From Swiss-Prot:
Domain PE: 4-94
Name the record gives this protein: PE-PGRS family protein PE_PGRS62
Species: Mycobacterium tuberculosis (strain ATCC 25618 / H37Rv)
Compartments in which it is found: Secreted, Cell wall
GO BP term, example: symbiont-mediated suppression of host phagosome maturation
Job description of the protein: Supports mycobacterial virulence via inhibition of phagosome maturation and host inducible nitric oxide synthase (iNOS) expression. May promote the survival within macrophages by disturbing the cytokines profiles and blocking the endoplasmic reticulum (ER) stress-mediated apoptosis. May also affect bacterial cell wall composition.
Top-level lineage group: Bacteria
Amino acid sequence: MSFVVTVPEAVAAAAGDLAAIGSTLREATAAAAGPTTGLAAAAADDVSIAVSQLFGRYGQEFQTVSNQLAAFHTEFVRTLNRGAAAYLNTESANGGQLFGQIEAGQRAVSAAAAAAPGGAYGQLVANTATNLESLYGAWSANPFPFLRQIIANQQVYWQQIAAALANAVQNFPALVANLPAAIDAAVQQFLAFNAAYYIQQIISSQIGFAQLFATTVGQGVTSVIAGWPNLAAELQLAFQQLLVGDYNAAVANLGKAMTNLLVTGFDTSDVTIGTMGTTISVTAKPKLLGPLGDLFTIMTIPAQEAQYFTNLMPPSILRDMSQNFTNVLTTLSNPNIQAVASFDIATTAGTLSTFFGVPLVLTYATLGAPFASLNAIATSAETIEQALLAGNYLGAVGALIDAPAHALDGFLNSATVLDTPILVPTGLPSPLPPTVGITLHLPFDGILVPPHPVTATISFPGAPVPIPGFPTTVTVFGTPFMGMAPLLINYIPQQLALAIKPAA
């Protein structure tokens, strides 16, 4: 077996030397161009005309060969630079990375748009109109769900109040007769109320929440400081890829750098494994680690506070309203992830459902539009560059004209996918697989992208024997992903409506 060892710095240095050689060649060509173009005009006799044509032909051939050599040299230097960047990227990947490379959702600019400049604008209008129609259709099917549920709850409360008043009127004589006893019982209950105990409990709970806040902030700051060197290295790699014209890879590494800073891993200790015959069922509740997970933990404190005070209230309409308010806070701040997978090893059939809390979906939607737009800009830049290198100047102009449309289409209607691997230990004995690998292909969606399922690749890394049919890519059921507009207009109001809906 043969191995090739490459030092990226040496490759980059070689590329620099070749670039210097290219500069020398260009200077020589320019120097030669002066004497061949600066000659006096030939005389009108036949001999002078023949000599002039001979030298003119050689001059044209010299310029043609020089241009071809310059183009070849430029492409060769670019290849070396990209090779150095690729080796650096490989070294970074071998050092261990949490998230995979970002796959561009729409990497290629259509050839038709390049041939007919401005075609991308028509596609932008068509995509935007389609997504707006989908957004309106989903909203009109269930308009203002949260507001309608609030109104429905008020109707229930008024019905309860009316029933209580009707009962009081119907039993008014008995209530009057029992009034002295009821007042005496209320006074006794008030005198027996242990105010000091509840005050102590409230103070203790507030101290606990304050400690949780301080500890979590400290962990987040520590994680950011620890991840800063890796961020700098990955940003340097992205910048180098940008310099050599590999714009999509630069955008991908920029996203990976920021993601690795905010999310350092997953806590997969909360796993439930079940087997029945050849079917393996796995229920995992991974928790985010890193600054983003710490931020989500801090976001849950108000909901915990609200739940604590709600629990102190006696059963009443006021408590029901307080519980609904608590449920709203919990829904908006719950960062939980739950993955439920079922695989039949014999038939390689299975299902996967993944449920994400609103903060996670909102985070992806917030970052989605800018990132998808940036990726579209990178794709247009590469298209322009490739067209120029190929001498297709019309195509370069067309791609330049269409670039703003592609950028806006990415911001509104496109998606860029980020691979998120999660390794879940099974704890199963050999020869069963010790680990289930779930690589979620999570999208960064444009603002108007309608709800859609995500996909995932299932594998069994470390299995004693290869399992036929794996790795395999499946459609993930559960929480859909979408752009910011359908998320805020439809999805979140629907989730809040479910949160305050009375139990059947």
